Design a protein with these regions (language model features):
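Defense-system signaling and execution modules centered on TIR/cGAS-STING-like, death/scaffold domains
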Residues: 1-11, 33, 52-60, 119-120, ...
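Cross-kingdom TIR/SEFIR domain
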Residues: 7, 15-150
Length: 204
């Protein structure tokens, strides 16, 4: 089974950097498993065009995490640029957008992302949990479930593509030869036969 590592984009206010770092820590097992890779603007290297890098990664991420605080809602760039672009990709089915409520915020339920399922569980802000680690575990578990769904859809898509390839005439013809040719003769000619039929297929 093969799948593409899930790209996660962090959309957050720099004033909330400590929250982002804590969340990254709680997602470290997913990273160790090779399931995800992170991107946030602190990864932009000296000399890079920061806006171009943000746009590039925001437009390719499988999952966009919105780290919701009053700082996030007050940031024109977070709200008007990153969040709105993330929601556009969500509407097109290109990305999964997950709002994470970090602190109590007045009015977030009137925002475009209010229609989405938020984390932690029941939308209780991370800072309102008795144990903050419990809150981040709840968030990480929710993100893991989303990742598993995306990987499942990737696997199903790959299986469908393979099936479609196998149903093409060149592959059917090779299958017929495999069934009727003596084992030793076929083994000696297998590579040439496959290449011959692949060349026919590629020319179509």
């Amino acid at each position: 089974m093969t799948f593409e590592r899930i790209e996660i984009f962090f959309s957050y206010s720099h004033k909330d950097e400590s929250f982002r770092e804590q969340l990254e820590t709680h997602l470290s097992m997913l990273k160790r498993q090779g399931l995800i890779k992170f991107w946030h603007d602190r990864m932009i290297t000296a000399g890079d065009e920061w806006k171009g890098q943000i746009d590039k990664n925001l437009n390719t991420a499988h999952i966009v995490l919105l780290l919701i605080t009053a700082n996030f809602l007050a940031s024109d760039y977070c709200y008007d640029i990153e969040m709105k672009r993330a929601m556009e990709r969500h509407e097109l089915g290109e990305a999964c957008v997950i709002p994470i409520i970090l602190t109590p915020v007045e009015g977030w339920m009137y925002s475009p992302f209010a229609k989405l399922q938020v984390l932690p569980k029941d939308g209780k802000p991370v800072t309102k949990w008795n144990d903050r680690d419990d809150a981040f575990v709840s968030v990480a578990q929710g993100i893991r479930r989303s990742i598993e769904l995306i990987i499942g859809s990737q696997t199903n898509s790959n299986d469908t593509t393979l099936k479609q390839m196998q149903e093409n005439e060149p592959f059917k013809s090779v299958k017929v030869i495999e069934e009727v040719a003596p084992d030793e003769w076929f083994k000696s000619k297998q590579s040439r036969i496959h290449n011959f039929f692949r060349s026919l297929f590629d020319d179509k």
